Design a protein with these regions (language model features):
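Active-site-facing substrate-recognition patch
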Residues: 1-64
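Short glycine-rich loop/turn motifs that provide flexible caps or phosphate-binding loops at active sites
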Residues: 28, 69, 136
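PRPP/pyrophosphate-binding module of the type I phosphoribosyltransferase fold
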Residues: 106-170
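Long, contiguous hydrophobic alpha-helical segments, chiefly transmembrane helices and signal peptides
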Residues: 24, 34-36, 48-51, 77, ...
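Residue-level detector of short coil/turn "hinge" positions at structural boundaries
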Residues: 32, 92-95, 154
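Conserved PRPP/pyrophosphate-binding segment of the phosphoribosyltransferase/PRPP-pathway fold
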Residues: 41-119
Length: 170
């Protein structure tokens, strides 16, 4: 990636910037003209909190979230989201009034699995899928299928690089 094509975009959050690089980027399922680097958002606590605050604002008290399923190394942001959701008194169905933060195991065919110890964190739970970005939707579709297969309900899909997905069918 060329540094001269990179720049920062200030967001409405004081601790949050988008780091963007213009160019031509190829992925397995498509091409993109811009790369948004979310490494700092995923690793720096102040930025993770700012992202979490923005994402939590889309969920009101009628959205029940029991588990946050992390894709793309989003555990720090998920932890901040869970902290904000539980502090705000959001409902969940877990006996201890806490939110599970879970990362799936990826198998060779591109599917996600959960072992015996973690499958219980999906079964009968309302699961929010958290990812860094949505380009083609393939990975999020695989995650949604896994949640349904293990007996969970997809409560929503959140991404640090996608503001809102309208009319999504779970």
């Amino acid at each position: 990636m060329s540094i001269e094509n990179s720049y920062k975009i200030r967001t409405k959050g004081k601790n949050l910037f988008l780091r963007v690089t213009k160019g031509h980027f190829m992925k397995t399922n498509g091409h993109m003209n811009y790369y948004i680097d979310v490494a700092m958002q995923k690793a720096r606590l102040s930025e993770a909190r700012a992202v979490a605050e923005e994402l939590v604002s889309y969920y009101n008290s009628s959205t029940v979230i029991d588990t946050i399923l992390c894709l793309d190394e989003m555990q720090v942001i998920a932890t901040c989201m869970a902290e904000q959701l539980t502090a705000a008194g959001f409902m969940n169905l877990n006996a201890h009034q806490t939110i599970y933060i879970l990362t799936p195991e990826k198998v060779s065919e591109g599917r996600f699995i959960f072992r015996e110890g973690t499958a219980a964190m999906i079964k009968g739970k309302n699961v929010l899928i958290l990812t860094s970005s949505v380009a083609t939707g393939r990975t999020t579709s695989v995650a949604m299928d896994a949640v349904k297969y293990y007996g969970g309900t997809v409560a929503g899909l959140a991404s640090s690089c996608t503001k809102k997905i309208e009319n999504a069918f779970f």
